[in-house]
UniProtKB/Swiss-Prot annotation:
PROSITE patterns: BTB. SMART domains: BACK, BTB, Kelch. The keyword Cytoplasm applies. It comes from Bos taurus. Keywords: Cytoplasm, Cytoskeleton, Developmental protein, Differentiation, Kelch repeat, Phosphoprotein, Repeat, Spermatogenesis. Expressed in testis and in spermatozoa (at protein level). This is Calicin. Gene3D superfamilies: 1.25.40.420, Kelch-type beta propeller, Potassium Channel Kv1.1, Chain A. PANTHER family: KELCH-LIKE PROTEIN 32, LD33804P. Interacts with CYLC1; the interaction may be relevant for proper acrosome attachment to the nuclear envelope. It is found in: Cytoplasm, Cytoskeleton, Perinuclear theca, Calyx. Required for both nuclear and acrosomal shaping during spermiogenesis.
Length: 588
């Protein structure tokens, strides 16, 4: 009789014991020295996973009793990384992070271990984001990782307006010439305008003038001077005086300026590259007159006082929410004829004019508030049914492709006003909830830390209004809350609220702001409002109509301006500020 017995996980058992022997320095026959640190191992194990070690053994005709010594340059691989590599060779497990991925790639290159290189490549692809795409592009070029290179380049191109800004240029000035030239040549480069592209070129050259001045002539040809403002052209002309062989460029600039003096003033918009960004307010969904739900997506181009239809949503809904993050607009939730709280979520690509279905929200929501903080999308509060509010704050995890519970507000609310500060904190200001059986807006400010998932500060204040307030930061610690009846300055450091005389005037139609309006801060103390319901002058009839107009509030002057009317009058649409590429004008 014969019986075969097989040990479970025997290979793992053997390697685990070999690794223990390695750490106890038992039966070793190979030593790796890095900056006075010596690591002992077994030739057979390393030869099985590393062609480098295998070739060293075979090329030197080593005997079984011989010992192999390898010295590694500490400037190439640190002792910590070598120790981590040996653990990987023995266990097949490795923890990769943004901090160690570069050295692990060097280790994979040094020991010629393609599987580790694949793991590093996968990590870079899954963890790429705006803040690290420049560094990842450097790594991709250095280690010839094409897929990572393409993704990182797209990330820089799509966020060039950030990298060329004062906030991002500190790191971007180190961009190699081959990458910088490729970016400037790209017609789809996301710049604020051609002025920013020209300024970026000048700053990049001046950062290392002796090394980069030779590239200026070639890269200058990638700038469309007809799309640059007179002010920036004159600034560039002055900068060129300090550069060698720049007379031809100065002549081109002067020619454009002279031609403009002889012609009628025209908009520079038609000359911008396809990727130049337009500050816009995007309106999505909503409910039309007579109760019909809408699926249209409209954009108001602020600079041109112009409305465009961008697309149609994959579903019809009102009381949904939206936020923009780079080239994408995220939408979720809402109500329809059949369902009062939808779980559905979608992402709209403004560049490609395409929609991608996202995983559903954990619960169906209406009147929730979507916001982007640190490049991550959040959903704050909301209602799951009439008079049933939630305190949940959800975060969309791009890597795991799922909605996660990030934390909770201090009380359940919907219709909240949210403002961000930095890449970490959400300030959730007032919201609707049940107070003694009645729907009421409460005066509360929650500072939600997205890193810890906790409300780290909660401030209450007396409230005399029932609409979503307008928010802004004055100085670092002063949060301003504006409404029709009262305005409050909240000192976050001293935890103190003071009333101010500033207030928000009624809309031009003499109606107050309402949760049904699309409200969006567009910067420079200006606020966009459209849609929503308005009451008739005869209060006794209690008739409501949908506001057909759009308005812009100048908070400094305290005045409303009537804008071009929206294509449709909509109640409870979603609204967000977005940067649309100029090619949308050509597409439409």
């Amino acid at each position: 009789m014969k019986l075969e017995f097989t040990e479970k996980n025997y290979n793992s058992f053997v390697l685990q014991n070999l690794n223990k022997q390695r750490k106890r320095k038992e039966y070793w026959d190979i030593a790796l020295t890095v900056d006075h640190h010596v690591f002992f191992a077994h030739r057979n194990v390393l030869a099985a996973v590393s062609p480098l070690v295998k070739n060293l053994i075979s090329n030197h005709d080593m005997k079984t009793t011989d010992e192999l010594f390898i010295t590694i340059d500490p400037n190439y691989l640190s002792p910590t990384t070598v120790d981590q590599l040996l653990d990987y060779f023995y266990s097949g497990k490795v923890v990769i992070s943004e901090q160690n991925v570069e050295e692990l790639l060097r280790g994979a290159q040094y020991f010629n271990t393609p599987r580790l290189r694949i793991h590093c490549n996968d990590f870079l692809i899954k963890s790429i984001r705006r803040a690290n795409c420049l560094r990842y592009l450097f790594l991709a070029e250095l280690f010839e990782l094409k897929e990572v290179s393409d993704l990182a380049y797209s990330g820089i191109r799509d966020n060039f307006h950030y990298w060329a800004s004062p906030e991002g240029c500190v790191h971007f000035m180190r961009c190699p010439p081959v990458i910088f030239g490729r970016l400037l040549r790209d017609e789809n480069l996301h710049v604020l305008n051609e002025d920013q592209a020209l300024n970026a070129l000048i700053n990049w050259v001046c950062f290392r003038k002796d090394e980069r001045e030779k590239y200026f002539k070639k890269f200058f040809n990638y700038i469309n001077l007809n799309a640059v403002s007179n002010k920036t052209l004159m600034y560039a002309s002055n900068k060129l005086m300090g550069m060698e062989n720049s007379s031809a460029h100065s002549t081109l600039i002067e020619s454009v300026l002279v031609d403009r003096k002889q012609e009628r003033p025209t908009s520079l918009l038609s000359y911008q590259r396809k990727g130049a960004l337009l500050d816009s307010v995007v309106i999505l969904g909503g409910q039309k007159a007579h109760g019909k739900f809408n699926d249209g997506v409209f954009a108001y181009i602020i600079q041109e006082n112009l409305w465009l239809k961008l697309s149609e949503m994959p579903y019809r809904a009102a009381a949904l929410s939206a936020t923009s993050a780079g080239r994408y607009i995220y939408i979720s939730g809402g109500t329809t004829e059949q369902i009062s709280g939808l779980k559905t979520a979608w992402r709209y690509d403004m560049d490609d004019n395409s929609w991608t279905k996202l995983p559903d929200l954990p619960i169906g929501l209406v009147f929730h508030t979507m916001v982007t903080c640190g490049g991550t999308v959040y959903s704050v509060g909301g209602s799951i049914a009439p008079r049933r509010y939630v305190s949940n704050i959800y975060r969309y995890d791009e890597r795991k492709e799922t909605w996660c519970l990030a934390g909770k507000m201090s009380i359940p609310m919907d219709g909240t006003a949210v403002i961000t500060r930095g890449d970490r904190n959400l300030y959730i200001v007032t919201g609707r909830c049940l107070v003694k059986g009645y729907i009421s807006r409460v005066g509360v400010v929650d500072c939600f830390d997205t890193n810890t998932g906790e409300v780290v500060q909660c401030i209450t204040f007396p409230i005399e209004f029932n609409h979503r307030p307008l928010l802004s930061f004055h100085q670092d610690n002063i949060l301003c809350v504006y409404s029709h009846r009262q305005s409050v300055e909240i000192n976050l450091q001293k935890v103190k609220a003071n009333k101010t005389t500033t207030s928000v005037p009624l809309l031009p139609n003499n109606c107050p702001l309402d949760v049904s309006h699309a409200i969006c801060s567009v910067g420079d103390n200006k606020v966009f409002v459209c849609g929503g319901v308005t009451t008739t002058t005869d209060v006794q009839t209690k008739d409501y109509t949908i506001n057909p107009n759009a308005y812009l509030l100048d908070q400094k002057a305290g005045e409303w301006k009537t804008l071009a009317p929206p294509p449709e009058a909509l109640d409870c649409p979603a609204c967000c500020l977005a940067k649309l590429p100029c090619k949308i004008l050509q597409r439409i």
